[in-house]
């Protein structure tokens, strides 16, 4: 019984620790997504190995840090496509993609349409941009 209690008592601490690392990672991503950061950069920032960071993200969020970073960037791209007149290349560069073709492929994979098609289906409205 004591062994079961000790095992259960340790779980929240490890989850809490993972949650702390994930929170620090999310803050780093939010501040640096516009740069071509990698999972290795995030892991180094929070002081974890790449594999430990992956486990922490999977435990806390159910996704990999790479997927979280990509999803975050695509959400930013959607906002810019809806609320600005920036070119697709400028948007790609502003969210950390140094290759607009790779950005377009990634966007299409996530959204089921190209950035251009997404923009056309969400016409720019100057009032929304304010």
What label would you give each PLM region?
Residues 1-30, 52-54:
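An amphipathic alpha-helical interaction segment
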Residues 50-51, 55, 99-101:
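The DNA-contacting recognition helix of HTH DNA-binding domains
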Residues 45, 94-95, 110:
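Residues within the alpha-helical elements of helix-turn-helix
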Residues 27, 31, 36, 40, ...:
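Terminal helix-turn-helix DNA-binding modules in bacterial transcription factors
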